[in-house]
Structures are given as structure tokens and as C-alpha cells.
Amino acid sequence: MRTAQQEIDERTKLAGNNKFELLLFRLGESPGNGQRELFGINVFKVREVLVMPAITELANAHSHLMGVANIRGQIIPVINLPAVLGCQPKNGLTILMVTEFGRTVQAFAVEDVREIVRLEWDQVLPAEASHAGALITGIARLDGAIANTRLAQVLDVEQILRNVMPVSHEELTREVVGPAMTLPPGSSILVADDSAVARSVIELGLNAMGVPFIMTKTGKEAWERIQHIAEEAKAEGQTVQSKIAVVLTDLEMPEMDGFTLTRLIKQDARFKSIPVVIHSSLTGTTNENHVKSVGADAYVGKFAPRELAATIRKVLALD
């Protein structure tokens, strides 16, 4: 029988090969067509799945916050996921998905959980390409690129969490992120993140740091941009390092994940000296160890501007 750590290690190895596991679930009938669509969340973000426990309602809470549940002594907020997406569960909310990401623990109530599927990231289309809503990061083609493949909507749980349980963050100013950074003339920080809320926070942070940046939405887009910049630099008689000071990348992204992007950069003689910082809500020792194995220079959790600024200074030796 495999241990929990063995399962984690196996999933971590998947990530290094541009693969991941998606937990599929249903929320009830969709508001548009009444169909019971499939939704998904990366298994790495799921701590456990439980039969719905007792919920204690909270006074004056957000309408989508059902209350809190006592899970083995830990008080965890419970979000009504069908209500967030406008779905109508016909069989009630029977399952609780307890999740952990971005250094917080929260649970999502759903109608039912279906299965775990193993996919490659290139089976996931970015939200913009599929005209999905603001709470969707991508559409997963569960059976590959065949005509009648099943589809699952990959939720932007970070955005959902911030909508339902907004956290007050300190204003992103020079006092927070430190003095302005000076990059070599003509160079920028290249960012890759599929989450709209994460991109907006990163943009605010980098603006406060006073550094120019290039924003991309997937690892594939970032990789293509790096190669394009390399060609431009070559034509100008310069190195790509004079154009890209740091690559700041998420881990979970449609088409190509951050692990694969990092490995491609570090295995290419033209790019391997460019510092790569993994910036992800998938915090934890296992992920941080795997980051080191693919050659990333640093790892920092999302929505921590002080730490992000300090990490960028460190990899650029600006301290």
C-alpha cells in the first residue's frame, strides 16, 4: 500500500513532465443550458474530500460563505461553490473539498465528486482561447484532441477565494517593497501567470518596485516570447540576458506549466544563466524541493509582495 508521501512524490514527478492530476466534480445544473457540467481543480490543492459535515453559519457573512466546519479541531470556512458559479444542485451539497493553497485552508461545498484524471497541460486551453468566464482559468480536454472529448472547466479558485473572502493587503508602496530596483538598461522581468488576479497583484508589485516587465499568461506563451526576444537580441548583437533580467513564473498554467518552462530555460545554453523565480500558491516542502531539481533559482508564495521583492533582489544580487 502506497503512503501519502509516495503519492505526493509521484504527483510531483508528473509536474516535471508537464502533467498533472485533476479532481473532477459537479455543481448541479448550469444557469445557461441546465446541463450538469464537469469542473476541475488541481489535486495538489486538495487536502481531502469529505462527506458534508455540520456547518455553523456566520452572522453578516458573504452570501456565498456557508459558514465554518470543524475538521479535526481546525475551524475551516466553507464556500458554496455552486452559488458562486450560479449552478443549481439537484441532489444537495453532499461533498466538501478541503483545499490548501496560498498559505490558507478553505473548503468548497459541491454536489458530487466524480474521479481523478491524469492529463498533460497541453490538453488545457487557456480561458481566453475558449472565451470562458472570469472564474475559469482553462478548459481541459479530458480525452485529448478528439472531436467528442469530454470537457471540464478548471476553476480559478484563487479568484473565487478573493471574491468571497477578500483579504485586506497593505498598499503596495516603496515602503512595503523597498527602494526602487535598477535593472540594466533595456532589460525587463518576464512574468508568466494564468490567473487574472495574480497578474494584477504582480503588476502592482513590480510597478511599486519600479521595474519594467513583460506579462504573459501561459508557460508556452512565455517560452515563445523568450525565443523571440533571443532572436531580436542576436540581430542587435546583444545577449538575451541583456533583455530579460528575471523570469517569474507560476506553476499551474494551461499548455505548459512552470516546471516545464523552467527546465526548458535551464537546459538551453542561451538562457540558463537567466534567474528563474517560481511564484506559486502551491507552497510546501515537496514543491520547493522539486523546484530546485528543475533548476529554478528561488521559490516564493503568491500574494507576498515583501517576500517577492526580497527574492528578486536576492537573485539579481541587488542587496
Q: Which residues are covered by each model-predicted region?
A:
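An acidic, low-aromatic, low-complexity terminal/linker signal
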Residues: M1-E221, R225-G237, S242-A245, L251-T260, ...
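Acidic-histidine catalytic/liganding microenvironments
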Residues: D268
